[in-house]
Amino acid sequence: MPRCERALPSRSIATMPAVFATGFLVGFLEWACLLVVKPHLDWPAEQTVGTHVDVSHEAATPPGLVVTARAKLVGVDGRKLRFEVEADDGIDLIARGTHERVVILRERFDAKVAEKAAAGSDPGRGGA
């Protein structure tokens, strides 16, 4: 399987159309979900992380338009939160879908990430 070893976009990204990119749109929708639940969490000890995204990017948005993201919490199953999301640019509905997040204890989460990072930097481990 090919590996992506670039941390920054290549020059080929510069040839992409000048529109609001899908990856940035998904991040913006995630942020809207966070704003919905943050007041109900013991922040910063409790936080949420995204676990699933099912979003259709339906229309291009050129520079200069204002994008508005909306998120509605539609389901809670233990620590799992399910949202309906959408975004518009004042002209078109540009995205709609669902997003799932899980409530985490930040300290515990950070400890697991640090453990994984240490294991990944072990030269005897091999890596992916």
What are these regions (language model features)?
Residues M1-A21:
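Catalytic strand-loop segment that frames the active site of acyl-thioester-processing enzymes
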Residues M1-R3, S56, T98-V102:
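Generic structural detector for well-ordered beta-strands
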Residues R6, P17-A18, P39, A59, ...:
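Flexible, active-site-adjacent loop/turn segments at secondary-structure boundaries
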Residues T22-V26:
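Conserved N-terminal beta-strand and adjoining loop/helix that marks the start
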Residues C33-T68:
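Hydrophobic beta-strand-centered segment that forms part of the acyl-chain substrate-binding groove
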Residues P62-P63, K72-A128:
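HotDog/MaoC-like acyl-thioester-processing domains
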